[in-house]
Amino acid sequence: MNTTTLTLNESWLSRRNLFDWVFAALVVAGGLFAFARYAGSMDYYEKPILIAAVIATIAIGWFWRPLRVLAIVVAAASLLAIASYQGDLARADTVFWLKYFLSSQSAILWMSVLFFMSTLFYWLGFFGGKQADTFDAIGSRLAWAAVTMALIGTMVRWYESHQLGPDIGHIPVSNLYEVFVLFCWLTAVFYLYFEERYGTRALGAFVMLVVSAAVGFLLWYTIVREAHEIQPLVPALQSWWMKLHVPANFIGYGTFALAAMVAFAYLIKEQAEEKRWYKLTPIWLLGVALCFVPVAFRQRVQEAGGSYWVIYAGISALIAAGILLGRKRIAARLPANEVLDDVMYKSITVGFAFFTIATVLGALWAADAWGGYWSWDPKETWALIVWLNYAAWLHMRLMSGLRGRPAAWWALVGLLVTTFALDRKSVV
């Protein structure tokens, strides 16, 4: 007689394999190396952030294994870039790897190109016939490559800022250029997690549209304002609360944007057989509006860039119209409505949790910088409006079973509310 021994209530740690522990050892070694080499350049708050980052990286890498490879590649490439500089930023113009790949600006330009290419291949997946799965796979790999270059650019930019002077170095989450890079890779990473979790790549075409829109703004902002230049922080931005507040905030913004694009896909699937164009017009208008989410930040700068935005508007309108024209073929490849609804719900749940944390951290930052937790100025008032909007969405979902088309429309309008709020308040 065969007997089988069952292990009940196996602990989380006991389920770790050899690669898990090797990864943890590498992360700890990297953290110790960073502390030993750069502790003198760290502010008092950056040391506990480093410790927390080591713990979080190990935990997240164990939870979602693709992030382990990402972390190792980013760390190796960042260290190669730092070693190539040899303490001289002028080497970015003479060393091949720095000039074309690993300086912060080069890496972020590669991020931009790769996100555009990823978006293209994801959309080719809807119309590629027998090659559709191949196109989707290429789109996914390009998205991973773009995230990798974004993180390399961020890490190297952090190093570059410290090389400019002891009072200039800072974690690169402090201006519009840096937070748009943050938004792009955070949104993409959350999408890639859902892609693996639900076993479908069809949503990549929609999510990468809003990421590409953000990249389009980033490139315009770089050209018009030379925003890639590293500048010293004003005193109010030197608070360590801000270094926690901004990433938490943009996890919220990124997942809210992801939920809105999934909601857009849901409505396209629902309207696949609709022939009356007047009923499709609201979806077309919202599709164009979604592409303009990053443009909420444009009026912060003085340069109009009129011709660029005319072209941008035209491309956005054509993309939205093309999606509606191909809605039957697109709907056929989209996952079931239940999957779309679940991704929407989980994205908003994650976003709401981090936006709540960011709001609390923002209040602590305000108290530290300006002496009061809450003053009802525009940025605080609109942050509260955004929070209440998504709190109401989740309440209706949990208490009244909000699902389907009403939930999708609300998620879409919710992102527009968030965009309007961002237009009325500072980035951070």
Predicted features by range, described:
Residues 9-95, 109, 113-117, 274-327:
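Transmembrane alpha-helices
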Residues 12-13, 39-47, 86-87, 147-207, ...:
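Membrane-interface helix-loop-helix modules in multi-pass inner-membrane proteins
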Residues 48-58, 108-121, 179-192, 247-265, ...:
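Hydrophobic cores of alpha-helical transmembrane segments in multi-pass inner/ER membrane proteins
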Residues 97-113, 167-181, 234-252, 307, ...:
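Short aromatic-rich membrane-water interface segments that cap or initiate transmembrane helices
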Residues 139-145, 206-211, 278-284, 332-356, ...:
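Interfacial and helix-entry/exit segments of alpha-helical transmembrane bundles
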Residues 168-177, 186-252, 269, 275-276:
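Membrane-interface helix-loop-helix junctions at boundaries between adjacent transmembrane segments
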Residues 427:
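Conserved small/polar residues in nucleotide/adenosyl-binding loops
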